[in-house]
Amino acid sequence: MASTYTGLGTQLMTTGEKAGTWGTLTNTNWNISEQIAGGYTAQALSTTGATTLAVNDGTTGAALANRVIEFTAALAGNVTVTIPLDVETFYIIKNSCTNAYSVEFKYVTGSGGSVTWASGDTGTKIVYATANDATNPDIIDATTAFVTATSTTTLTNKTLTAPKIVDGGFIADGGGDENLVFGEVGTPVNE
């Protein structure tokens, strides 16, 4: 039985195969594993249309086999970035593209879920490629559940330990009728 390869290019050698070459092949596999575990790459995208992230089995350097990917390009239109159907991993992806166009990250074929950076969004997302279906796998945006500095997430029944509110900041009630305003000196005033 011949060697096979994982979706990210690691060679799975059959017992008894490749006599005398295991050292070299194993070292390459370890390098691929390190790249997958924590590698970073800046990936220049096509300025319009699609960019395909591919893997060369048994070799290092494939952009899609890095944990962190930064998309770069001066976009001239909406773009799509695709990965092969058998890739199952998670990524931290930063969209550093300029110009106000969207970037969609998806599997190469199928109608499964994808992740999109809206026009002008240069944020960072944690996404995972599920490979959960042979023809329509999903890519999921794990960051949609995060509370960030710019999000408008509603916190219900949460305890904030030692929150800091800026001078002139306020807490509004749900109906928008009253505010608790914080000033630099003195006590909070209920308005």
PLM regions: where:
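Exposed extracellular interaction/assembly regions and N-terminal maturation sites
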Residues: 1-9, 14-103, 137, 159-191
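A broadly tuned, weak detector of single residues within folded domains
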Residues: 18-19, 84-85, 120, 148, ...
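Flexible coil/loop interruptions and hinge/linker segments embedded within long fibrous stalks
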Residues: 26, 144-150
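Beta-strand-rich solenoidal segments
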Residues: 79, 87-88, 101-146
